Amino acid sequence: MLDSLTQKNKKDLHIYVVFSIITIFVFLLLAYFSFGSLINYKNDIVSSFYNKTSDPIKTSATSVTKQLILIIIDGLSYADSDKLPALKEFKTKSVYSKIEILQPTLSITSWMTFMTGAAPEIHGFVSPLGEKIKYEPCENIFTSAKSRTFKTAVFGHPDWKKAFGGHIDVSYYAGFKPDNTDIIQIDSQIMSNAMSHIRYQKPEFSVIHLPGLDKTSHLFGRAGHEFKVHLQKLDDILKTFLTSSLVNDRYVIITSDHGHVVKGGHGGGEPDVTGTLFMLAGPDVIAESNIKFLQIDQTDICPTICSLLGIPIPYLNGGSFLARLFSFPDYIKILKMKAVLSQKSLYFKNYVLASGGRPPNIFNYEAYAFEIEKNAGENYAQTLVGLETYEKKAGIEFKNLKDEGNFYKKLYRFFYLSFILAAFLAFLVYKFKNRYRLFSALAQIVIFYSIYYGIYFFRGFSFSLSDFNDYAYFDSFMNNRRIEAVCALLLSYTPLLMNCFFMHKRLYTWLNYVFFPVFIEFNFYLSFTLAAQCAYYIFSFGPVLTNSLPEMSSALKYYFDIQLMILTQAVSLLIAAAAYFVLAAAAPRKSGDGIYKSSEIL
């Protein structure tokens, strides 16, 4: 078998084929488990107390409002919010700021963070919903309100029903038609129904979700005429609501779940995608032109809503009550801050215990609060500052403990990955010593990456979840990238093929003494470079996601590298087979004694 090859080529090709098949199998498994751990992600540390609920006495304070309305404008970037005169006018009556949406910047991910106060790595909803919800969400504003028999309402896209439907009392859902002919009208329908229901049924907590602008951005981008027309229509809708009597004596929060890149798309960490507007108006709100002295996080929205309504703070909340935005007395702010701190300290303790650690004394909230109030006496302002300082210190300590646990995992991964890569590199150095062939193989690798990444970046992509615009386009997006990878791989052989014409050797000789040696070396070193890139990701985040999320651009790059490894190895096996058939056809005839004639070899 393979008699047309030299003995060295035959041996090396056998080694490469076995290596390639094993590599394809291993990386297929890696792709399956890595991708699956993201799609089906659930924090394994939090899972033991994921469904716990907060103590309704310790984690809630007296209500300061009868009704609160949260408006989520789907897909509105902070930069585009300035193009809405209705919001500009509303700024004079509200406090507003730019907030950063946590990654991945998907709608369901942001909604869960708004409703639970938990970061995505805690609440676990980091992929599109699909046909049904993967598991019941943790304690959230809707369940907390229900525990106090408060009426809740949602007016928006049907995905809200999938996520929270069983805990919502009043609802109106409007989905898009298959031909998308109702994009402009859908926001108007939702707002009209919301205003009618809120006016007559008076739910304590209402969510108005306007999904139309997001769909327009996906289809046409943010620079087109369609987007401008939709902004004008959206401005009219918001003006109708914000000038109505519904905003009187009610708290109103306006925000967005994410923005869009200019060409349309979200999910990544681009400034236009993560930067959104936060506006708050209502009784006792300190209306200013802008908030420059206070950092507002996305997780702060949930505990602020719960504190205003006087309902329990969700158990996994990691945000803070935005006390500085309100003018009501300090003693009321203190009561609400203590409710949040009671919840957070218990959550921090349970997280550390579940991760196998020992909670530090700083998580003993009651003792710290007692000391703060004792030292401040009746100076409520001093007590408020003391509680804010304690909350920051406890939050920093909690973050440090989580980072410390990840550090030891990274150290372990560093040792075993370094050993594997070092052994692989030592094998390559020992096996392939011919400088000319090494130079040819490395030059081919440079050509391959230059062509592949050149095409990718030329098309305006940047290893972001925003690149493929919508999850529905993910498969077609990846198929196009696979085609580009195959083209880049085939084109990288161009210099090697040109060598065949310049050397003026018989095809048989060139294949045996130039092509196959360089081909084998190229594929081994290409595999090493891809393995090294995958190893860096695994070192940083692990082969599967268990209790933390990666930076999403790194995760997408890792997925691409796995795909490249599998694809290049599979295509290279086909190239090797095709090259051998050509070699066998071009092989010189043997003489009667079984010896090749030198004239036919050369």
Regions found by a protein language model. Name each.
Residues L2-K66, A584-L602:
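N-terminal secretory/membrane-targeting segments
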Residues L13, S20-T23, Y32, G36-I39, ...:
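A long, amphipathic alpha-helix that forms part
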Residues N51, V64-K202, I301-P303, S307, ...:
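Active-site-proximal alpha/beta segments of enzymes that process anionic O-linked groups
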Residues T109-T116, G268-I313:
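Substrate-binding rim/cap in mid-to-C-terminal beta-strand-loop elements of soluble/periplasmic
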Residues H123-S127, R222-G224, V262, A281-I291, ...:
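Flexible glycine/proline-enriched surface loops and loop-helix/loop-strand junctions
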Residues S256-I286, I334-K336, S464-N469:
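Histidine-centered active-site microenvironments of extracellular/periplasmic hydrolases
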Residues S327-F419:
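Phosphate/adenylate-binding glycine loop and adjacent helical scaffold
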Residues E404-L602:
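Alpha-helical transmembrane segments of integral membrane proteins
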